[in-house]
Design a protein with these regions (language model features):
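Gly/Ser/Thr-rich active-site loops/lids in small-molecule metabolic enzymes
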Residues: 251-264
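Gly-rich Lys/Arg/Thr-decorated short loops/hinges at beta-loop-alpha junctions or inter-strand turns
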Residues: 19-24, 50, 126-135
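Short, ordered loop/turn segments at secondary-structure junctions
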Residues: 26-28, 58, 84, 114, ...
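Metal-associated gating/positioning segment near the N- to mid-region
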Residues: 1-48
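Short catalytic-loop micro-motif centered on adjacent basic/acidic residues
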Residues: 24, 54-57, 160-165
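Short, acidic/polar
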Residues: 3-11, 61-71
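Short beta-alpha connecting loops at secondary-structure transitions
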Residues: 206, 247-252
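Histidine/acidic residue-rich metal-binding segments in metalloenzymes
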Residues: 65-233
Length: 264
């Protein structure tokens, strides 16, 4: 949505935040799930991006042939899989489909890890006008159960994967025991903010997926970072208009800017 940001302004924001290279996600409008759309995005980037860049290709359960077409193109940094639904329409929640994708590409696959079945059944916990209920809806188990399955599939497929924006102490413990095929990242938002204060002060502006959780989880993320055991600090850059974020929860979109504020 270029009303929020475009390739030029996004890359300038990255440079302002001290970032010289960006990997842009495929959950655009439309989602980048075909070679034609990927090439169109690459073409748009020429002469507009002010930093080094590459683009993720969006996986769907039925676009493996498109993945094979795109993976060798210069400018494709990897494949993105949304195991749980988030911002945009991309979703691959069936474990058999996930493993087929793992086996289909030599590119690194990065995962948004939340259990879609649990997100559906727990949606009743997202209370109208109460942004702090976001972490109740998308609770620890929705993330942990998904990440556990991804690790199992990676070990089975012997495929190296990357799990994005880890938020829970339980996931950290699990991931540190399973490093052979799995790398992972955390975001500044989850390292700095914590519930319930963030929701009291920021409301829907603190709403993101996976959600910001309590102090116990934040402290574990910080300690793991201090020990040098976290592979990447990722921005999870997801800007929205104020008019969108000011909507009553849960109609408000999840996500917040990240590249210009990655590190102080």
């Amino acid at each position: 949505n270029t009303k929020k940001e475009n390739l030029k302004t996004g890359s300038l924001a990255a440079i302002a935040g001290g970032i010289t290279s960006v990997f842009d996600m495929p959950n655009n409008k439309p989602s980048i799930t075909t070679k034609k759309l990927f090439m169109k995005k690459l073409q748009k980037a020429k002469g507009r991006m002010h930093c080094n860049y590459a683009f993720y290709f969006g996986a769907e359960k039925d676009n493996i042939e498109e993945i094979k077409k795109v993976e060798k193109i210069r400018g494709c940094c990897g494949v993105k899989v949304f195991v749980g639904s988030s911002t945009g329409t991309l979703l691959v929640s069936d474990q058999a489909d996930i493993e087929r994708i793992m086996k289909s590409t030599k590119k690194m696959i990065s995962f948004h890890s939340e259990n879609e079945d649990m997100l559906i059944t727990r949606k009743k916990y997202a209370k109208t006008g109460r942004p702090h209920s976001h972490q109740v809806w998308r609770n620890v188990d929705t993330a942990l159960s998904s990440t556990r399955k991804l690790i199992k599939s990676a070990n089975k497929s012997k495929k190296k994967i990357h799990v994005l924006h880890i938020t829970t102490a339980e996931e950290i413990k699990l991931l540190l025991r399973n490093r052979k095929y799995v790398s992972f990242e955390v975001t500044p938002q989850h390292l700095v903010l914590a519930s319930p204060d963030c929701y009291k002060k920021l409301g829907t502006y603190a709403q993101m997926n996976p959600p910001i959780r309590g102090v116990r989880h934040r402290n574990v993320l910080r300690k793991t970072l201090q020990k040098g055991q976290i592979d990447i600090i990722g921005s999870d850059h997801a800007p929205h208009l104020k008019s969108e974020k000011n909507q009553i929860y849960p109609n408000s979109p999840s996500g917040m800017p990240g590249v210009q504020t990655l590190l102080p």
